[in-house]
Amino acid sequence: MKDLLNLLKNQGQVEEFDAIRIGLASPEMIRSWSFGEVKKPETINYRTFKPERDGLFCAKIFGPVKDYECLCGKYKRLKHRGVICEKCGVEVALAKVRRERMAHIELASPVAHIWFLKSLPSRIGLLMDMTLRDIERVLYFESYVVIDPGMTTLEKGQLLNDEQYFEALEEFGDDFDARMGAEAVRELLHAIDLEHEIGRLREEIPQTNSETKIKKLSKRLKLMEAFQGSGNLPEWMVLTVLPVLPPDLRPLVPLDGGRFATSDLNDLYRRVINRNNRLKRLLDLSAPDIIVRNEKRMLQEAVDALLDNGRRGRAITGSNKRPLKSLADMIKGKQGRFRQNLLGKRVDYSGRSVITVGPTLRLHQCGLPKKMALELFKPFIFGKLEMRGLATTIKAAKKMVERELPEVWDVLAEVIREHPVLLNRAPTLHRLGIQAFEPVLIEGKAIQLHPLVCAAYNADFDGDQMAVHVPLTLEAQLEARALMMSTNNILSPANGEPIIVPSQDVVLGLYYMTREAINAKGEGRVFADLQEVDRVFRAGEAALHAKIKVRISETVNDRDGGSVSATRIVDTTVGRALLFQVVPKGLSFDVVNLPMKKKAISKLINQCYRVVGLKETVIFADQLMYTGFAYSTISGVSIGVNDFVIPDEKARIIGAATDEVKEIESQYASGLVTQGEKYNKVIDLWSKANDEVSKAMMANLSKEKVIDRNGDEVEQESFNSMYMMADSGARGSAAQIRQLAGMRGLMAKPDGSIIETPITANFREGLSVLQYFISTHGARKGLADTALKTANSGYLTRRLVDVAQDLVVTEIDCGTEHGLLMTPHIEGGDVVEPLGERVLGRVIARDVFKPGTEDVIVPAGTLVDEKWVEFIELNSIDEVIVRSPISCETRYGICAKCYGRDLARGHQVNIGEAVGVIAAQSIGEPGTQLTMRTFHIGGAASRTSAADSVQVKNGGTVRLHNLKHVERVDGHLVAVSRSGELAIADDFGRERERYKLPYGAVISVKEGDKVDAGAIVAKWDPHTHPIVTEMKGTVTYVGMEEGITIKRQTDELTGMTNIEVLDVKDRPAAGKDIRPAVKMVGMDGKDLLLPGTDVPAQYFLPANALVGVADGAQIAIGDVIARIPQETSKTRDITGGLPRVADLFEARRPKEASILAEVSGTIAFGKETKGKRRLVITPNDGSDPYEELIPKWRHLNVFEGEQVNRGEVISDGPSDPHDILRLLGVSALAKYIVNEIQDVYRLQGVKINDKHIETILRQMLRKVEIAESGDSSFIKGDQMELTHVLVENERLSTEDKFVAKFTRVLLGITKASLSTESFISAASFQETTRVLTEAAVTGKRDYLRGLKENVVVGRLIPAGTGLAYHSERKRRRDADKPLRVSASEVEAALTEALNSSGN
């Protein structure tokens, strides 16, 4: 017995390790793992079912089949443990050693390992400096390779086919050695002198000029250094011994009916053994060369199939035509070892059932069916029954539970008390998808869920199912209660706003009770206190909506923790007074003295949380819910067909639109407008009509006429049921009501383009057959979209989690002074996000001064909370530099100051918080709400984009930002730059609106002018691009010959003549190389120069430009020389929604990206090539000019002689993030990506905090490219981890050596995940084979810093409570360090020493 206890104790010891290293196994190492050689392909005896000796399941090699029993049955029981039976040779041990004991196969001829051969880039190929095809020809016995040329003219590594080989034999005899097959490759690899080669390559690289050659050499050099550093020998990539997997990991299971189910690996091993044995026999018989050669080739193919079936040639299939699953297939993909078993395990103690509503529950409770609870808590019940003496043994307890005796239920109730359970709803898209509740036993079979947590789970009660898990250990229960309880997760981690927000019925009820009605019963009465209001309402003496006065006493907490009590009389309604009864002390009456729409309720809960704290808020949320349900029941709101009131104006509006469309059709028929223009105009018209109808409808619905107390007819907000639902935010939206009572509007075709004929009917009138047919398409597309979206969104989340999983808060402060500049986010005339909102929860990086003074009003290092936000807004501060995850200088992980506030808790983030995963989930979770569509500019979308003026919304002072302009004779300014912006600042100097000014805009105000609201301050023609002169003079035409480069056009309507520049394609041969231009000459007939340069002022005219000035005409500054019609610039598709977010995170280079100026300087055009223009920028500092070839069809924004700054746009198009990083730096890139991603989410009304996006961006910017290696060991052009380079540079600078110079590189999330330091994390993500091959060759160490690696090796993750565990473990181990070295460590050290010295 004592033996047994010791045995159990020994099994429980955990290996202590800090890193995992992967490498190539030497033949000696494989033999040292092995317990014997497998010599026969047999598996088990078909009669006795016992394993065959020396076969694939041999008990002598792998261990006994039954516990403590040898095969022949001579030794049984525990007492013979460790005895080796002399009859059958089997050791008496536990049967589970068959899971760990390996064997080996001695190969009769060496075999190349397919991973190192075929996984690109081929490692064997790189080392030997041969192409993959050549090596394959050698390996598969098609050519000879020269191993030792001796004194002959042959070269080492040269390939010879049969003829050449025999010729060489005749010529040189035995002076040279050439062979084929893997042994030849092994010899060549063995002969490589790594040290000598590395030295040679290091000398060769600096002397090479060609880029491709340098790349190739540095690849080889890296590989050789990896081999040298890791202690792997190149010849180990060719196997001479093959390890055999333990038999219980490739089981053979008897099925009923005498058949067997077997793992595919057994078939693959059998082929290898068969071929190997046949080859041995052939070699013993010294068979003819050709036969041996064929057998060797077959052996190579068999081993290939075993290691990675289908990697080369056709996959070997089993009896059912299905490819066999090889060792590589076992570990890769969703069904592979990593994702199926290591990262996604099944869980015991769990149940699942349908969910129903639990409106009577408290927020921290869930209803658990008794039957389910009984099953889940069984072990606890058994224990309790035994402890109470109700059952003598566990077996008896089990019987009691099965019979469901009354005592059992009592015990169950006791066991369940204060034992939280976890509820999970798939898909778990963010951490709120699993929360803890206290179970309440209920009858029935469905789980009851509290309505307020539905939003977090995204659950509804139309048949959703949820899973229940029981936290078993005390620690697990503690964490569930303290961290996962639904009451502790009131705020969403994505944006810090409450996620416990009432929806639907509750909102409707609260809205209904806080509305006011004119002339309701009891209007105008005055009440002494809230209790009186309650009594009168219950007695039916006052209606819920009656306007009354009431005396209230309230206590209001301020931000600093003090509170003020007061009594006052307020104007309100009965309903609001009743609602105030449930509002916690500390909030003012004003928070409920308004109609409670969904936004208002959310704001109320938020305010409650910030002012009175968590506990009160939870109680309040529950009370709100109960009240809401009660009053939505009382309201009796329902929908009937008569609620859809169709506006009378609808017929008139549609009639007018139809007439206009007819007019456009007739214009098109007579050729005045093009097809495209007609289409755009018609769609514009119908969009306008639709808007008008819906405006009329909403106006109609939202107001109703009533008689007031004085008998007059007045308007009040409508009590129409449908309007109330939409207005409160309970259900439905204006767009949906429009389809019910307005008109359905325009529909889209399958390709996303809009159909010209709209559906003029609505659902109340009913659709005609044609209209129904048109609309089916959109409905079906909606469903198909949803299915696609879910998969794509899930994949995006997976990639995001993977790239950010190892980002954990590891220290309080990294001490950096850098940060990001935050300004209010202003689009057009709207402040989309005020500065206060953007800096909330961030730490200030540099002191903030009061505008115009030197007074510090917010010191650096302040965590901005709501109080500070008010302060910043009050002092009209325009910009603040805040700490950001991107600029954090913590080596591994991130510091709390750079991250700022933990959004879900409302205080500074704790050390150990897994901020990377939270960021990934926050971005990925709303992904399913994004659209999959790409928008075509055209139709409804383009109406907004064709702005032609700036009309200011608020009065204020004009500010012009980086605007280059010239002043016209009439005093107006004309913009001659593209990045110019016009902003309006209010009296405090805060910018309230900001507009982009296109080139050629005429601005009627100057910097510092005061303007009134509604003033139009700038105008331009949206349909053409002008070319504006910057000087006055006389026009001279250059190269403008009619019929050759230009054509004259007379407008039919106006009779005016235009000159149009011909496209190069349409010109005759004589005009192909002529560049038409307009030149400016002075009074004296000399060429004028552009101001500030010595470039002649001439404006080259692009194709299709319309010239508006005559030859010899006098023109003034700011006049327009020519216009380029806008139609020519191709209509781009705007990628919207999910694909856009994915593109940004993958850092994909857009097609036809905008071209940015690489240097600052003056523009000129050089000699053109076929189809391309040569753009030359001469830098102002006199360094070498920069040249770039640009395709002719790209429309350039710059003219000869113009000044540009580095990073300015030369040719429009979507921005390329890589260019922004290279030319403008990290903070410009951060601003661009954050804004672009936020735009997509904002369009769907999703709020995500900027710092989540910055957190992911930090991971995308992990790598740098070495520009100059200095004295470091890096190679120029290498991509290295930033931290790695910084550490190396610190070391070099302390030794007074030259440091390496580098540039930051932006990697897409997939690439960043695959290039992470941890090979376990990368291998479990994608491209498993490639990652593992790379890691093995370089002998990589994984220091298990991330979360994923630790989950894979089965440890606690180093985040949250696990971080404490890990640091304690390290501390303990460091304290015990000198004391003991375990036997396994000694053994490991010995084998490593043997391996490195062996061979």
UniProtKB/Swiss-Prot annotation:
Q: Which residues bind Zn(2+) 1?
A: C70, C72, C85, C88
Recite the UniProt keywords alphabetically: DNA-directed RNA polymerase, Magnesium, Metal-binding, Nucleotidyltransferase, Transcription, Transferase, Zinc
Could you state a single Gene Ontology molecular function term?
magnesium ion binding
Q: Does the keyword Transmembrane apply?
A: no
Superkingdom, taxonomy of origin = Bacteria
Q: Name one GO cellular component term.
A: DNA-directed RNA polymerase complex
- Which Gene3D superfamilies does the UniProt entry name for this protein? 1.10.132.30, 1.10.150.390, 1.10.1790.20, 1.10.40.90, 2.40.40.20, 2.40.50.100, RNA polymerase II, clamp domain, RNA polymerase Rpb1, domain 3
Q: Which family does it belong to?
A: Belongs to the RNA polymerase beta' chain family.
**What PANTHER family does its record include?**
DNA-DIRECTED RNA POLYMERASE, DNA-DIRECTED RNA POLYMERASE SUBUNIT BETA
- Free-text function comment from the UniProt entry: DNA-dependent RNA polymerase catalyzes the transcription of DNA into RNA using the four ribonucleoside triphosphates as substrates.
Tell me, how does this one assemble? The RNAP catalytic core consists of 2 alpha, 1 beta, 1 beta' and 1 omega subunit. When a sigma factor is associated with the core the holoenzyme is formed, which can initiate transcription.
Official protein name in the record: DNA-directed RNA polymerase subunit beta'
